[in-house]
Amino acid sequence: GKKTWTSFSREALYDINSFLKLAVPSAVMVCLEYWSFEMLILLSGLLPKPQLEMSVLSICLSTTSLAYMIPFGLGAAVSTRVSNELGAGRSRAARLSAHVALCMSAMEALVIGSILFCIRNVLGYAYSNEGEVVDYVSSMMPLFASSTVMDGIQSVLSGIARGCGWQKLGAYANLGAYYVVGIPIAVILAFVLHFGGRGLWLGILCGICAQTILLFIITLRTDWGKQA
């Protein structure tokens, strides 16, 4: 080990500012999205039936995390592919990669969303034997399946944004979508209009839709020639 370790060198910090300009906004972009879902669980503890609401929303969050892995992988792949193609000056190839990944994510999201909707009456039993919890999970499935579809599409759009170096723009989009649109609507629906856990999830669905629309507009208006 000592023969291969040459000790730390200041050269490792060379051009660190360029790295941080991408790394920090990228971390903020991801964290803002993940934290918004965690806030739902915290807010559910303030509802009239906290144990039931927290159980159901935890089930939804666990399931959406599982379903998110496939589009997350597509997002990581398209991020690498787009950045490589743009770096090589192949703007048309980068654009084609983005379009193919978007089509794949849309088809995958529709399939997963449809499956979740079809098994809505039995999915709850994978987590709980309590009839009240299972019935509540079943009633949440239309909203949950819709959010799964939108989340799958935005995952690839986020990957395209990272591949193009739009981390800062993506962070602003996520901030606005989740903390200006999603969470406030969730709070109003859950606590003012008394929709409970459904209101919380409907609010975050509005946030996902806003995020997807913003990222889609950014991608649609991209001049791929200038990006390369």
Where are these regions (language model features)?
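Short alpha-helical transmembrane segments in multi-pass integral membrane proteins
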Residues: 1-24, 82-148, 181, 189-228
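Helix-terminus/linker motif at the lipid-water interface of multi-pass membrane proteins
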Residues: 6, 27, 31-62, 66, ...
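General structural feature for long, well-ordered alpha-helical segments within catalytic domains
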Residues: 12-20, 24-27, 35-40, 53-55, ...
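Hydrophobic alpha-helical transmembrane bundles that constitute the permease/transmembrane domains
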Residues: 19, 27-42, 46, 66-77, ...
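Small-residue-rich hydrophobic transmembrane alpha-helices
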Residues: 56-120, 152-165, 169-170
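A short pocket-lining beta-strand/turn micro-motif at the edge of beta-sheets
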Residues: 167-169, 185, 198
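Hydrophobic alpha-helical membrane segments of integral membrane proteins
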Residues: 172-173, 202
